[in-house]
Every structure is written in C-alpha cells, then in structure tokens.
C-alpha cells in the first residue's frame, strides 16, 4: 500500500516520531512522510508510534491507497526533505 503520514506532536516527542517514521517512509516535508509499506510494516509503524505518542495531545493522520499512481501531488514553494521520486 502507498501511505502518506502526517503528524503533529509536542516538541519533546518530535524527534521520536521523526526517527520512527524515517525507518519506514521517505521524509518529504517537515512532519510529512510517504512511501510504500506492506501490511506488516504498516502495523509495526503504527504500533511503534502509538507507544511513543501521547494520544490525548498528539495526532497522526494517515492516507492510504493501493498505488502511488492514484495520488496526484502538486508542489509549491521551497522543496523540503527527500525529493527522490517515490511516485
């Protein structure tokens, strides 16, 4: 599956969320990651994040699709993160 993950966490938890997401996905912009994951990788990522974050304060939003070809992406402004083609 192709995943776009966005997180908003307290500053003290940002480094952990960043490190965890980078193990599984490409960093594309500040708190935004994308990439292809198997079902097992997705479950492992979400379990790890769930254990690291305060779910009464932090939030994660995940968009999933079968293929990156189904996602249309448009960039404006200064590119951040890893600009290698994921799509």
Curated annotation (Swiss-Prot):
MF terms in GO: metal ion binding; RNA endonuclease activity
One Pfam family of this chain: CRISPR_Cas2
UniProt binding sites for Mg(2+): 8
Keywords (A to Z) from UniProt: Antiviral defense, Endonuclease, Hydrolase, Magnesium, Metal-binding, Nuclease
Biological process annotations from GO: defense response to virus; maintenance of CRISPR repeat elements
Cofactor(s) the record lists: Mg(2+)
Keyword Hydrolase: yes
InterPro entries from the UniProt entry: CRISPR_associated_Cas2, Virulence_VapD/CRISPR_Cas2
Keyword Nuclease annotated: yes
This enzyme's EC code(s): 3.1.-.-
Subunit structure: Homodimer, forms a heterotetramer with a Cas1 homodimer.
HAMAP family associated with the record: Cas2 (MF_01471)
Main function: CRISPR (clustered regularly interspaced short palindromic repeat), is an adaptive immune system that provides protection against mobile genetic elements (viruses, transposable elements and conjugative plasmids). CRISPR clusters contain sequences complementary to antecedent mobile elements and target invading nucleic acids. CRISPR clusters are transcribed and processed into CRISPR RNA (crRNA). Functions as a ssRNA-specific endoribonuclease. Involved in the integration of spacer DNA into the CRISPR cassette.
Family the UniProt entry places it in: Belongs to the CRISPR-associated endoribonuclease Cas2 protein family.
UniProt name for this protein: CRISPR-associated endoribonuclease Cas2
